[in-house]
Amino acid sequence: MPKTIIPLTLINLNDDGFHLLVEIVVYRENHLVVLDTGASRSVFDIAFTDQFALKPSTDDDLVADENFATTLFSTSNTVIATFPQLKIGRMVLSEYAAVALDLTSVNEAYEQLGHPKVAGILGGDILFKHSAKIDYKRLKLTLSY
């Protein structure tokens, strides 16, 4: 099974912990997402999905109702949309059904701390399926695909 190794960026949250950021590519544009091993599902900012994803999904496995996605940031109403292609390192996810949340407050907090804007949160659905290994010492994420 091929593997891809992706560099991680460590950001300090004013001595109140840290987050790891991962670069993804959508439509040949680079974007950052937060790596969150505690998030059961990856989520993307609703403005990001409005710009890059296709119309809302009708996938029966993913029901968009209130309080569907809980992350380290919030519990919120959700929308589901599909990204034709989402690239993480050399791994390409086709027709990825994405949960969309309003991450405005997250990005405002990051901005106040001098950190870059994030497009979403990389969660357990992708991390588990692709046997994620996080090397904190070397700041690398390894995914199998």
Tell me what each language-model feature is.
Residues 1-145:
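Pepsin/retropepsin-fold aspartyl endopeptidases
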